Amino acid sequence: MARSIKKGPFIEKSLYQKVLASSGKEKRVVIKTYSRASTIIPEMVSLTISVYNGKSFIPVYITEDLVGHKLGEFSPTRIFRGHAKSDKKGRK
């Protein structure tokens, strides 16, 4: 179910303050956050935000195409290593 329009997009307050503070600076700094549920807003475009996936921070460069998505979508938490190989092929 989508979020109500009257509520607006969710973004953590501390993350929003960091985004506003870094948007005025010429030097781009990487913003670290644990908030995977925060929505990407237009003010974040051209910033690099490191999102925590439970083990490490994954840097995400924000472009216009990512606006409206959640930060957690671009920081996978699980690693697929492939299915177990069966030994039945060689046996007969």
UniProtKB/Swiss-Prot annotation:
One of its GO terms (biological process) is ribosomal small subunit assembly. Gene3D superfamilies: 30s Ribosomal Protein S19, Chain A. InterPro entries: Ribosomal_uS19, Ribosomal_uS19_bac-type, Ribosomal_uS19_CS, Ribosomal_uS19_SF. It comes from the Bacteria. GO terms for molecular function: rRNA binding; structural constituent of ribosome. The keyword Hydrolase does not apply. Coiled coil: none annotated. GO terms for cellular component: cytoplasm; small ribosomal subunit. Keywords: Ribonucleoprotein, Ribosomal protein, RNA-binding, rRNA-binding. PROSITE patterns: RIBOSOMAL_S19. Protein S19 forms a complex with S13 that binds strongly to the 16S ribosomal RNA. PANTHER family: RIBOSOMAL PROTEIN S19P FAMILY MEMBER, SMALL RIBOSOMAL SUBUNIT PROTEIN US19M. Belongs to the universal ribosomal protein uS19 family. This is Small ribosomal subunit protein uS19. It comes from Borrelia recurrentis (strain A1).
